[in-house]
């Protein structure tokens, strides 16, 4: 998911997506440990998506505090 797409979502929606991605990451790591994972690049992709979402949430927090 691109940053532009993430910015169009509300903060609550982003937090829901982060939760879903964390669950997916857990499952991917489990599959990796058991030797069932075919696409190992997906782990990296999910981690980066989570980081992007957290960054955008933090940017919004900083912007909100700056307005006060």
From Swiss-Prot:
InterPro entries: Ribosomal_protein_uL29, Ribosomal_uL29, Ribosomal_uL29_CS, Ribosomal_uL29_sf. GO terms for cellular component: cytosolic large ribosomal subunit. PROSITE patterns: RIBOSOMAL_L29. GO terms for biological process: translation. Keywords: Ribonucleoprotein, Ribosomal protein. It comes from the Bacteria. Gene3D superfamilies: 1.10.287.310. GO terms for molecular function: structural constituent of ribosome. Pfam families: Ribosomal_L29 (PF00831). PANTHER family: 60S RIBOSOMAL PROTEIN L35/50S RIBOSOMAL PROTEIN L29, LARGE RIBOSOMAL SUBUNIT PROTEIN UL29C. Belongs to the universal ribosomal protein uL29 family. This is Large ribosomal subunit protein uL29. It comes from Geobacillus sp. (strain WCH70). The gene is rpmC.
